[in-house]
């Protein structure tokens, strides 16, 4: 089972709001997910992001692969840097 950290689209038409979820890569974009680890609202200025850092680091350490967009969000929040430091300083 390949696990991804990706965006799940919520909100109404032309008013997107995203949940950052951990899901099996075979499940649909807005379908079944394993865990919710954050939210992302691109319409606010600046974009509003809420992340559960410990949960995300745990999933990354267990082999979950972030999507490109989620990887950018995590990089801006500094989580990817912490993950790489922990991974390569063992």
Swiss-Prot record:
Transmembrane segments: none annotated. Coiled coil: none annotated. The keyword Translocase does not apply. GO terms for cellular component: cytoplasm; small ribosomal subunit. One of its GO terms (biological process) is translation. The keyword Hydrolase does not apply. It comes from the Bacteria. GO terms for molecular function: structural constituent of ribosome. Keywords: Ribonucleoprotein, Ribosomal protein. HAMAP family: Ribosomal_bS16. Belongs to the bacterial ribosomal protein bS16 family. This is Small ribosomal subunit protein bS16. It comes from Lactiplantibacillus plantarum (strain ATCC BAA-793 / NCIMB 8826 / WCFS1) (Lactobacillus plantarum).
């Amino acid at each position: 089972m390949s696990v991804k950290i990706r965006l799940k689209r919520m909100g109404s038409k032309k008013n997107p709001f995203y949940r950052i979820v951990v899901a099996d890569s075979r499940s649909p974009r807005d379908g079944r997910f394993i865990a919710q680890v954050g939210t992302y609202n691109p319409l606010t200025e600046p974009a509003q992001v809420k992340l559960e850092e410990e949960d995300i680091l745990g999933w990354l350490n267990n082999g979950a692969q972030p999507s490109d967009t989620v990887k950018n969000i995590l990089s801006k929040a500094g989580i990817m840097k912490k993950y790489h430091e922990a991974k390569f300083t063992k």
